[in-house]
Amino acid sequence: MSKSDYIQNMFQTKSFVDRYKYTEKLTGLYAQTLVDYSGVANTSQKPLVVLDNACGIGAVSSVLNHTLQDEAKKTWKLTCGDLSEGMLETTKRRLQDEGWVNAETKIVNALDTGLPDGHYTHVFVAFGFQSFPDANAALKECFRILASGGILASSTWQNFNWIPIMKAAIETIPGNLPFPTQKEFIALHNAGWDSESYIQSELEKLGFRDVKVIPVPKETSIPIDEFFEVCMMIIPYLLPKFWTEEQRESHEKDVPMVLRQYLQDTYGANGQVPLEAVALITTGLKP
């Protein structure tokens, strides 16, 4: 299974989608930051035509709807696009529950969107470029569908501490079982998107101007039970890449118990897991 197959298969499964809400404690930390850095709330462009690309369960769209003035939302158009029907079902419920105005959900393949040329004033891609099967193709699509003067705003992970926490838990299992470091985990995804210079170069090569790539650190904490769910969303897709079949047969069934025990021993039975991350917030203008 290729890198892209592993990621794409993961996003399509029901168990992953069901648990994805817990990741918003992590990814959602940056939704407001991404919207703020895009300048969308202060732009003179009217009407706004916005694509939340690879929208997941709608964290960025939710922030947009809470941030923009009612006057702007009277004339704007928001499209929440994702390739996962399960994600879009959750986003659609959120759209209805929160009363988003002039918004729609749509199946969108970020690599080949089928959306019109030069159409959008803003395209948001929150933590998508590291997961796309072809990040360069997705970036070209963003450039193509943006109108002149349009803004691309994206977030990508530079570093975070949750993979090291999982690794420490797995290492309590006897047998010297392998588990990726943070660097090895990031290497499973598209290379370069954790580097300011790489991102700036890629956007400028394509024609973006006024490119800014800013590292933004954040800290939070979440209950053990929620962090456990995040781990169990990710670990089943990592073990086949790092464990032999024999190791999986012998130890995979023990992972949930071992993980929970490690978290309770480390942070207390009802404790909070401290999470730290740095994301790169990127903005670029299409001339």
UniProtKB/Swiss-Prot annotation:
GO terms assigned for molecular function: methyltransferase activity
Subcellular location: Cytoplasm
Recorded superkingdom: Eukaryota
Reactions mediated catalytically: a thiol + S-adenosyl-L-methionine = a methyl thioether + S-adenosyl-L-homocysteine + H(+)
Range of residues in the leader sequence: none
Principal subcellular localization: cytoplasm
Binding site for S-adenosyl-L-methionine: 27, 54, 82, 87, 109-110, 126, 248
InterPro entries recorded: SAM-dependent_MTases_sf
Induction (free text): Induced by exogenous gliotoxin.
Record key words, sorted: Cytoplasm, Disulfide bond, Methyltransferase, S-adenosyl-L-methionine, Transferase
Pfam families named among the record's database cross-references: Ubie_methyltran
GO terms (BP aspect): methylation
Record-listed E.C. numbers: 2.1.1.9
Entry GO terms, CC: cytoplasm
Disulfide-bond pairs as recorded: 55-80
Family: Belongs to the class I-like SAM-binding methyltransferase superfamily.
Protein function: S-methyltransferase that catalyzes the irreversible conversion of the secondary metabolite gliotoxin to bis(methylthio)gliotoxin (BmGT). Gliotoxin, a member of the epipolythiodioxopiperazine (ETP) class of toxins, is characterized by a disulfide bridged cyclic dipeptide. Its thiol groups are essential for bioactivity, as they conjugate to sulfur-containing proteins, disturb the intracellular redox equilibrium, and generate reactive oxygen species by cycling between reduced and oxidized states.
Protein known as: Gliotoxin thiomethyltransferase GtmA
Organism expressing this protein natively: Aspergillus fumigatus (strain ATCC MYA-4609 / CBS 101355 / FGSC A1100 / Af293)
Gene giving rise to this polypeptide: tmtA
